[in-house]
Regions:
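Nucleotidyltransferase catalytic core that binds NTPs
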Residues: 1-190, 525
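Histidine-anchored nucleotide/phosphate-binding helix
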Residues: 52-68, 245-260, 365
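Short internal beta-strands
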Residues: 68-74, 129-130, 265-270, 376-380, ...
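Glycine-rich phosphate/adenosyl-contacting loop at the front of the ribokinase-like
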Residues: 185-265, 457, 461-464
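Substrate-binding N-lobe of the ribokinase-like
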Residues: 235-304, 519-521
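Conserved phosphate-binding/catalytic loop of the ribokinase/pfkB sugar-kinase fold
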Residues: 295-301, 306-345
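Conserved phosphate/ATP/ADP-binding segment of small-molecule kinases
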Residues: 350, 363-453
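Conserved post-catalytic alpha-helical subdomain immediately downstream of the catalytic base
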Residues: 432-435, 459-523
Length: 525
């Protein structure tokens, strides 16, 4: 089955190659030369993260369709199976495949689909496992476009029928991908039909009309290298390297909501164009195309900006500067804002409020939201700019509330309070709400379920950047509850969103429905 040498013999062209693993452009030239001899070329594509007997049988069956078998694998940065995947880097996966006698060539594709490899190889047969035979069961939707592309080159999409294993299932069962609490929780969840329930919930969310309200925040990352203590001052000197500017705050929430719902309206506050660059062009450029935005302009004030000075190697924040005017909006601006907000609330199935405490949402706006929202989901944030002044009890009622542990403890004025007691008793005493979730970083989240609390463990891998993780959690959990799911499902999905987000620097990209579904599916295998 396995060979010690990478040298092999199929024809003259192949004998001249020094290795089976080729860059995609070189593979294309090699296959073009091979095809001239009349050989039929077969292509398989996948992640092949943990090579197993199911893969071997699939590859042997694929080889039977032609004379030459090419296997392409998805590059590490494009594997959408959740944090911690792939378990093995692309070159190790490629090396393992190349050692199989049945495989003639291997290449790594730096894209999330098989399209580049299909274009390069132009296979006579593109072979997939029988789990892809029904296009409706392919949550990525790629099998349809891949079939069309293969057929455009005169090839044919075919399926193998044999024993089926899952690399994700094997990794989950036999490798310590998650800690003990997560493994036990997932083992119980696998005994239910959670995944199908979740997919039905997504289908309901897709039909909703969602209005998002909150402040836009510009997140600026200034990358610097620490040089050491300044000679004459008690400060650390740094060397400027680069910077990135992201549209964050409520923009991130709206964009993440747009991943699961095409009907998202946004009402947000930004700075006065007359007062300088209010970053409106950047904001509009970064909004998801399906998000319909309405801007409220703060007279004479800037768009809220948080500049973080960051050590780039490990994305460690050194210090932060706020640029903002967080005083209450002038009466005429507030009245105009409430008028347009009232019109939008009347048409919304779900109203998502991201209250960052920077002056947009006052008591009058809270009253309007509580009276007119059909389903009100609220996140009231405590941050360095408002600590102690923006607590959840500014809302007397809502339908779903999501805060982190510090925000919950501030609200109940007890820094040592147990989170289960906060979720089940103390928060409901403050706010008339049936659905509470309190997030707790690596410890997961606590959700109110019946008269008790359930702890849902976190699933994240290595933490790259925590900025926006709570917003991603809220953006996915809120519509789940509004669509009829219980808080346990909402908390699970929120943890999935947060786990994906902590692997992304700033807001370089937002979540997609496909990666959320794929990660849920991966966890439950």
């Amino acid at each position: 089955m396995f060979r010690r040498s990478e040298k092999f013999s199929t024809d003259k062209t192949a004998q001249e190659l020094r290795t089976k693993v080729l860059p995609l452009d070189q593979l294309a030239r090699t296959i073009e030369s091979v095809r001239k001899s009349g050989q039929r070329v077969v292509l398989c594509h996948g992640v092949f993260d943990l090579l197993h007997v199911g893969h071997l049988r699939h590859l042997k069956a694929a080889r039977a369709f032609g004379d030459l078998l090419v296997v392409t694998i998805t590059g590490d940065d494009f594997v959408n199976k959740g944090p911690g995947r792939p378990a093995f880097p692309s070159m190790l996966r490629a090396e393992m495949l190349a050692e199989l006698e049945v495989v003639d060539f291997v290449s790594v594709v730096e894209e999330a689909s098989a399209h580049p490899s299909i274009r390069a190889v132009k296979p006579d047969f593109f072979v997939k496992g029988n789990e892809y035979a029904d296009p409706k069961k392919d949550i990525s939707g790629k099998i349809v476009t891949e079939r069309e592309l293969v057929e455009s080159f005169g090839g044919q999409l075919v399926f193998t029928e044999d024993i089926t294993f899952s690399s994700s299932n094997l990794l989950n069962r036999y490798f310590n991908v998650h800690d003990q609490s997560a493994r036990e929780y997932l083992a119980d969840l696998r005994q239910t039909d959670f995944e199908s329930q979740f997919n039905r919930t997504l289908d309901r969310i897709e039909k909703m009309r969602i209005v998002v309200v909150g402040e836009t925040i510009i997140d600026r990352y200034v990358y610097v290298d620490a040089m050491g203590k300044a000679a004459k001052e008690n400060i650390i000197a740094t060397l400027y390297r680069d910077e990135e500017v992201f549209a964050g705050g409520v923009i991130a929430v709206a964009n993440n909501l747009a991943a699961v719902c095409p009907n998202v309206e946004l009402v947000t506050m930004i700075g006065d164009p007359a007062a300088g660059d209010n970053q409106e062009d950047l904001i509009r450029k970064n909004l998801a195309p399906s998000v319909d935005a309405t801007f409220v302009y703060r007279p004479s004030g800037p768009t809220v900006q948080k500049t973080r000075f960051v050590e780039p190697t490990y994305v460690r924040k050194l210090f932060e500067i706020y640029h903002m005017d967080d005083t209450a909006l002038p009466r005429n601006v507030q009245d105009s804002f409430r008028g347009l907000l009232s019109d939008k609330l009347a048409q919304a199935d779900l109203v998502v409020v991201c209250d960052f405490g920077h002056g947009m949402i006052d008591a009058g706006t809270v009253d309007l939201l509580q009276k007119e929202a059909a389903f009100l989901a609220v996140n009231v944030q405590s941050n360095a700019g408002n600590i102690g002044y923006n607590l959840i009890d500014k809302y007397s009622r809502c339908d779903f509330m999501c805060v982190d542990a510090m925000e919950a403890r501030l609200a109940v004025r007890d820094k040592h309070a147990g989170l289960p007691d906060i979720v089940t008793r103390r928060l409901p005493d403050l706010v008339d709400c049936r659905n509470f979730i309190v997030t707790h970083g690596r410890s997961g989240c606590y959700v109110r379920k019946g008269d008790g609390a359930v702890c849902i463990p976190s699933f994240g891998g290595a933490v790259v950047d925590t900025v926006g993780a709570g917003d991603a959690f809220f953006a996915l959990s809120a519509p789940c509850v509004a669509a009829g799911a219980d808080c346990e499902m909402a908390g699970f999905v929120g943890n999935v969103a947060g786990a994906i987000k902590i692997g992304i620097v700033g807001h370089r990209r937002y979540l997609s429905r496909f990666e959320i579904q794929r990660y849920v599916s991966t966890l439950l295998k």
